[in-house]
């Protein structure tokens, strides 16, 4: 199942997940009609944190994706790329796509380097901050094609993305298996060329519903 989801790469060193920087959603999307995206991060700890952010382009957001070169140096920009985030504070990070306006969907890993700080020396003459704990967090940004073609096929409880942009698909209604209760719901990201079968919702039931999002547009399927 995870092969059809946009994954999170999360590596910790010297810090527990509960203490890590809150970077919001695992996967973010920039629709075809937008060239900017804002992402709010939050420091929920009681100490200041030094945040450094780096971007990598990926061949795929799936487990077998490799880091590849960008088409141009300023293909994807962000600001700020480095900041000191006080305790219990939040900050908005902005991303700007300036790459090719073609029919290709592009994927990027946002790498967040998070370091907790403590004052090593508190005298006014010589004060320095030293990292005492750190984390490396990876999230995914998918940039839809500037020339997006949304197409799909649905049959017998299975959706296939025949277009060139990732779809957010969902099904809701009676559960397929009684052990799961009466009402079930499924949500997935479906990349171009991929298929997905719903396994919890009884889509064959008259009350079973299937729908998807094409960018910001909601499309009922069944």
Curated annotation (Swiss-Prot):
Pfam families: EcpB_C (PF18649). Residues 1-20 form the signal peptide. Keywords: Chaperone, Fimbrium biogenesis, Signal. The keyword Disulfide bond does not apply. Induction: Negatively regulated by H-NS. Positively regulated by IHF and EcpR. The keyword Signal applies. SUPFAM superfamilies: PapD-like. InterPro entries: EcpB_C, Ig-like_fold, PapD-like_sf. Belongs to the EcpB/EcpE family. Part of the ecpRABCDE operon, which encodes the E.coli common pilus (ECP). ECP is found in both commensal and pathogenic strains and plays a dual role in early-stage biofilm development and host cell recognition. This is Probable fimbrial chaperone EcpB. It comes from Escherichia coli (strain ATCC 8739 / DSM 1576 / NBRC 3972 / NCIMB 8545 / WDCM 00012 / Crooks).
């Amino acid at each position: 199942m995870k092969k059809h989801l946009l994954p999170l790469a999360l590596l910790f060193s010297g810090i527990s997940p509960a203490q890590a920087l809150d970077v919001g959603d695992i996967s973010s999307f920039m629709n075809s009609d937008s060239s900017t995206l804002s992402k709010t991060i939050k420091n929920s700890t009681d100490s200041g944190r030094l945040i450094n952010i780096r971007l990598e382009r990926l061949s795929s957001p799936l487990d077998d994706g490799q880091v590849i070169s960008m088409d141009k140096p300023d293909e994807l920009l962000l600001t700020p790329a480095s900041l000191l985030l006080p305790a219990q504070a939040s900050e908005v990070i902005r991303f700007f796509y300036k790459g090719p306006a073609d029919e290709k969907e592009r994927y990027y890993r946002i790498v967040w380097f998070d370091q907790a700080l403590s004052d090593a020396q508190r005298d006014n003459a010589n004060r320095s901050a030293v990292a005492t704990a750190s984390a490396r967090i990876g999230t995914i940004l998918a940039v839809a094609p500037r020339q997006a073609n949304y197409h799909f096929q649905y049959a017998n409880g299975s959706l296939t993305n025949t277009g060139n942009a990732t779809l957010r698909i969902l099904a809701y209604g009676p559960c397929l298996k009684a052990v799961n209760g009466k009402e079930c719901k499924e949500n997935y990201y479906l990349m171009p060329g991929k298929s997905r079968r719903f396994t919890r919702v009884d889509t064959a039931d008259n009350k079973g519903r299937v729908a998807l999002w094409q960018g910001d547009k909601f499309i009922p399927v069944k």
